[in-house]
């Protein structure tokens, strides 16, 4: 039985993670960490009808009193690194779904994980289909090096481009030499019209109500194009990946960035 604490239970992703932990026989949800509602029970919150699970606002106190195995952090980019550091201090393995980590953050957190001999997972996207999309895009980039990424999310998302888009670009860059795309004399008549630049690739971010999480990787070649697309239609689509991450993190002794590293 894996003892779990969820940070950010009232968010859309957090609510799905709570349902996952309550229905999985091998998971035990021992507490949740929220920005408010300290001392209440989960089932007493507006978003939930069940769950005899205590609510904390102090993560360190929560860990000290319940000694969980795993933290599932689904809060906001501003809190991800701090929550991971608190988890390491208490011997807890973090599974983090927030984005916005810099390369320096990843390096520092990897050192902390290895010093504590604890597993940790940061997942820009938990959807298995999205992970496959990234892996397929990396394979395609070996043969077609003209590529642009279009990602679409709901209009409440704080960061742009998305962590999934950045991770996709990073994977492509591993097999593709930097290349400036478009005409050599190309100019933007409006700033930002061509999107963000990553090694010459362009990343375009769309934010609209009614969207959840969508990404298309577009490749162009002589006389042909290739499109690789993934759509998450609801947040339940992320839960198989969350389950996989929780099951795998207890077997690790370092930080893994991206679920693609856990899928053969």
Curated annotation (Swiss-Prot):
Q: Which residues bind (S)-2,3,4,5-tetrahydrodipicolinate?
A: 154, 163-164
Record carries keyword Amino-acid biosynthesis: yes
A GO BP entry is:
lysine biosynthetic process via diaminopimelate
* Keywords in alphabetical order: Amino-acid biosynthesis, Cytoplasm, Diaminopimelate biosynthesis, Lysine biosynthesis, NAD, NADP, Oxidoreductase
Q: Which residues bind NAD(+)?
A: 8-13, 97-99, 123-126
Positions bound to NADP(+): 36
Q: Localized where?
A: Cytoplasm
**An example Gene Ontology molecular-function term:** oxidoreductase activity, acting on CH or CH2 groups, NAD or NADP as acceptor
Reactions listed under catalytic activity: (S)-2,3,4,5-tetrahydrodipicolinate + NAD(+) + H2O = (2S,4S)-4-hydroxy-2,3,4,5-tetrahydrodipicolinate + NADH + H(+); (S)-2,3,4,5-tetrahydrodipicolinate + NADP(+) + H2O = (2S,4S)-4-hydroxy-2,3,4,5-tetrahydrodipicolinate + NADPH + H(+)
**Enzyme nomenclature, EC number:** 1.17.1.8
Q: Which residues cross the membrane?
A: none
**InterPro entries from the xrefs?**
DapB_C, DapB_N, DapB_N_CS, DHDPR_bac, NAD(P)-bd_dom_sf
UniProt keyword NAD present: yes
List the active-site residues. 153 (proton donor/acceptor), 157 (proton donor)
Q: Enumerate the Pfam families for this protein.
A: DapB_C (PF05173), DapB_N (PF01113)
Main location as per UniProt: cytoplasm
Pathway given for this chain reads: Amino-acid biosynthesis; L-lysine biosynthesis via DAP pathway; (S)-tetrahydrodipicolinate from L-aspartate: step 4/4
User: What class does this enzyme belong to in the EC scheme?
Assistant: oxidoreductase
One Gene Ontology cellular component annotation held by this UniProt entry = cytosol
Q: What CDD domains does this protein's entry cite?
A: DHDPR_N
What protein family does this chain belong to? Belongs to the DapB family.
The protein's matches in PANTHER family, at most eight in alphabetical order, are given as:
4-HYDROXY-TETRAHYDRODIPICOLINATE REDUCTASE 1, CHLOROPLASTIC-RELATED, DIHYDRODIPICOLINATE REDUCTASE
Q: What does this protein do?
A: Catalyzes the conversion of 4-hydroxy-tetrahydrodipicolinate (HTPA) to tetrahydrodipicolinate.
Q: What is this protein called?
A: 4-hydroxy-tetrahydrodipicolinate reductase
**Which species expresses this protein natively?**
Shouchella clausii (strain KSM-K16) (Alkalihalobacillus clausii)
Taxonomy of the source species = Bacteria, Bacillati, Bacillota, Bacilli, Bacillales
